[in-house]
């Protein structure tokens, strides 16, 4: 017969009582009143914070944007087709954040930092808030290092520095994305991490950009954040902030980063759609009143860190699309006032075969020559003024029948200068090659050539310099100055190549 030992039983009961841990969990919940068009109205959620993530019964995540007296307006991060009226919603107590790590390099992700390239999960041990405050005044220092784009027109006349915000603005189909992607291609070997954010674009266009990066070996140092035209407005609105959070992760690790937002017009449209559906009062062009803040808080995150923070940098190249060259529309004027300069691309120049179609007259960099190496300052100092004068003279010359010799010479020089600024897509030039090219044009060595021969001659000259005068590139890259020795080598190479070229053309 089994004997029951009272002391043993009491010990077991005591142990169980000691182990018992009652967890009290307060969950902030609400009920769906209505849902549709990517917006849900929720009754309840009394303790919810602005910008807090909420989770619906069937798993969809949303962001609480409108906190009203009778309900909460939530924007959905999915299609929300399975959400039903009356279903429950709970507040998560978190605001939007994404995982970050070095493993993101070379990957294509969406606005929630989930991979969409079919290459498996991305490991990350750390996370960053999608919206984080921009560095303060003390945390910054002025821009002084150049960020080379590989495009002669930009690096010589509208230079961009590390930590600058430079707007690329123009009509559709004027080569805005091409300027941005060429800049990424030119960062190879420069120790710059690039983030390309595609907002509301065609999936085929994004695929084309990714293919170009892969073929040119640029994906090794690039992250692509893509929310295509069929994505919800919420995700298109979030994509630039996700890209900025990834770039910041590297910036605060004392690295240099370049981020491209392609394009902010589409983000503003997505935000307008969300705001109107949430019944926020519309302002100019039906955009909400805080659309300026939408872009300013994003672009202010680009900075050049102070020496105390390790001198990392985040350079932003936002793209904005204009309608028939109207730079005075709402979004273009907003972004122009936030950025440190703009590169204006003209449809007329593009159609005239001048590519990149940069209108040098109204493009400007507010950092200026602080973001150029000394060699570039030496050769490109007067070229912007010369080109502006040439454009004015060219317009006048259309009406004048007989021009004096000096004017004819100035026109001929201007035409050759404009010709040397032309570049094929995905063919960025090293800064040493740019210095040689501009020096050749600015010092009249191209005057003896026909306009149609200029491009061919310059290609041959750059090859000649690379193979026969490698010391020239070494001097420029080590001293960053066009020294007397470098100039002598360059003059020699130009004379040799000019004689050879003219001989070839005669035969």
Curated annotation (Swiss-Prot):
Matches recorded under Pfam families: ATP-synt_ab, ATP-synt_ab_C, ATP-synt_ab_N
Instruction: Write the Enzyme Commission number(s) for this entry.
Output: 7.1.2.2
Q: Does the keyword Chloroplast apply?
A: yes
Q: Name one GO molecular function term.
A: proton-transporting ATP synthase activity, rotational mechanism
Q: How does it sit in the membrane?
A: Peripheral membrane protein
InterPro entries found in the cross-reference section: ATP_synth_asu-like_sf, ATP_synth_asu_C, ATP_synth_asu_C_sf, ATP_synth_F1_a_nt-bd_dom, ATP_synth_F1_asu, ATPase_a/bsu_AS, ATPase_F1/V1/A1_a/bsu_N, ATPase_F1/V1/A1_a/bsu_N_sf
Protein purpose: Produces ATP from ADP in the presence of a proton gradient across the membrane. The alpha chain is a regulatory subunit.
What's the protein name?
A: ATP synthase subunit alpha, chloroplastic
Q: Which organism is it from?
A: Ceratophyllum demersum
């Amino acid at each position: 017969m089994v004997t029951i030992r009272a002391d043993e039983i009491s010990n077991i009961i005591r142990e169980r009582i000691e182990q018992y841990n009652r967890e009290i969990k307060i969950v902030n919940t609400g009920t769906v009143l209505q849902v549709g068009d990517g917006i849900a109205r929720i009754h309840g959620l009394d303790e919810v914070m602005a910008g807090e993530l909420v989770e619906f019964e069937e798993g969809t995540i949303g962001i609480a944007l409108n906190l009203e007296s009778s309900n909460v307006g939530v924007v959905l991060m999915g299609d929300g087709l399975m959400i039903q009226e009356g279903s429950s919603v709970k507040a998560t107590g978190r605001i939007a954040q994404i995982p970050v790590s070095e493993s993101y390099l070379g990957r294509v992700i969406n606005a929630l930092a989930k991979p969409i390239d079919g290459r498996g999960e991305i490991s990350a041990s750390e996370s960053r808030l999608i919206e984080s405050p921009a560095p303060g005044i003390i945390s910054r220092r002025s821009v002084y290092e150049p960020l080379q784009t590989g495009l002669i027109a930009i690096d010589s006349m509208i230079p961009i520095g590390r930590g600058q915000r430079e707007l690329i603005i123009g009509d559709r189909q004027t080569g805005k994305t091409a300027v941005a992607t060429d800049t990424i291609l030119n960062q190879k070997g420069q120790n710059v991490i690039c983030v390309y954010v595609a907002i509301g674009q065609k999936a085929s266009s994004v695929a084309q950009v990714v293919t170009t990066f892969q073929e040119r070996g640029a994906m090794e140092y690039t992250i692509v954040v893509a929310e295509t035209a069929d994505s919800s407005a919420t995700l298109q609105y979030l994509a630039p902030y996700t890209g900025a959070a990834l770039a910041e992760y590297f910036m605060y690790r004392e690295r240099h980063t370049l981020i491209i937002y392609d394009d902010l017009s589409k983000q503003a449209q997505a935000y307008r759609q969300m705001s109107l559906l949430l019944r926020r009062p519309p302002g100019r062009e039906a955009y909400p009143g805080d659309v300026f803040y939408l872009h300013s808080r994003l672009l202010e995150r680009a900075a050049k860190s102070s020496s105390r923070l390790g001198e990392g940098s985040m350079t932003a190249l936002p793209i904005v699309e204009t309608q028939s060259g109207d730079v005075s529309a709402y979004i273009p004027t907003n972004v122009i006032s936030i950025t440190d300069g703009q590169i204006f691309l003209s449809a007329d120049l593009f159609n005239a075969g001048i590519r990149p179609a940069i209108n040098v007259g109204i493009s400007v960099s507010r950092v200026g020559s602080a973001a150029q190496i000394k060699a570039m300052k030496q050769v490109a100092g007067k070229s912007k003024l010369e080109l502006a004068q040439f454009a004015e003279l060219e317009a006048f010359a259309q009406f004048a029948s007989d021009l004096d010799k000096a004017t004819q010479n100035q026109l001929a020089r201007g035409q050759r200068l404009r010709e040397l600024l032309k570049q094929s897509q995905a063919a960025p030039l090293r800064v040493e090659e740019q210095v040689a090219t501009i020096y050749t044009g600015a010092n009249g060595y191209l005057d003896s050539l026909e306009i149609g021969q200029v491009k061919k001659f310059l290609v041959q000259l750059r090859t000649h310099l690379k193979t026969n005068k490698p010391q020239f590139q070494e001097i420029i890259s080590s001293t960053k100055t066009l020294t007397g020795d470098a100039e002598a080598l360059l003059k020699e190479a130009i004379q040799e190549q000019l004689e050879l070229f003219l001989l070839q053309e005669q035969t």
